Amino acid sequence: TPEEFLECCRVFQENGIDTPIGANRWWLETFVFAQAYADLYNGGTTEAEIAALNSGEAKYSDYMRPGFQFLQTLIDEGYVDAEKALVSEAIEGEGPDFLAGKTPIVMAYWGAANSETAYGKTDFEMQVVGFPSSRGQMPVIPITGWGVGANADHLEDALEVINVITSDEALQLYSETNRVISPSKNVKVDCVPSLRPLNNRIEEGVYVLGSNAGMKVEQWGNTCRIVRELLGGATVEQCMESFDRLQ
């Protein structure tokens, strides 16, 4: 939960780790999504809640506020270095301290479980877990999609290529080679040990989406941009006003 996560950070700091969370300007919105949408995606009322957001009956700011308040607490307590995060690229900003053991917590995509392709080879074991939420550790899943232009010169060829790339056979090969979390219900794979805590939650059907084409307000990019406003000194309520303007 958020409270348990804050307690972990407090203990880290008491034991000499000044900044427990390595952050950058791209990925802090993951904390927000986990808290904002834990109930929306896992409470059995997903369609109705999204319809209310799209119609304006409900406000995105009401969903986002707890996550932004949580980020503000991380900043105020010194668990995140806001000034550094605001100017840091993904992995480059926090990577060296993570490898050196100075920063125990970082945000990363699942592929970072194979850390040699992300942070570099580690001399410690790591675990990939979900983000803190009212429902416990929460996987945040950004959707990656494929698209073909309707007027493409080689439309049929392009569609055929996508069909091959996204086939069960291709996804099985990809998953087995990289030992990552399965991208398809039709593909079973033994992921690397560090991913198992996250994989277990996903197999239980517990997760939130970081992107959703069914929402009229684009999620990932807009939230990332407004998080940067917070890192730059805006108040939580000023950030909520930014969401209200989008809606």
Short names for language-model regions:
Residues 104-109:
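Paired acidic/hydrophobic, glycine-rich loop segments that form the ligand-binding mouth/hinge
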Residues 2-6, 84-99:
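Short helix-initiation/N-cap motifs at beta->coil->alpha
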Residues 9-11, 53-85:
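Glycine-centered hinge/linker elements that transmit conformational signals in sensory
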Residues 16, 201-247:
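Conserved C-terminal helix/tail region of periplasmic/extracytoplasmic solute-binding proteins
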Residues 40-66, 118-120, 130-139, 196, ...:
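Short, solvent-exposed loop/beta-turn-alpha elements that line the ligand-binding surface or hinge
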Residues 4-56, 103:
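Extracytoplasmic/periplasmic solute-binding protein
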Residues 117-180:
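Extracytoplasmic/periplasmic substrate-recognition and gating elements
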Residues 39, 43, 77-80, 151-158:
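Short helix-loop capping/hinge motifs at secondary-structure junctions, enriched
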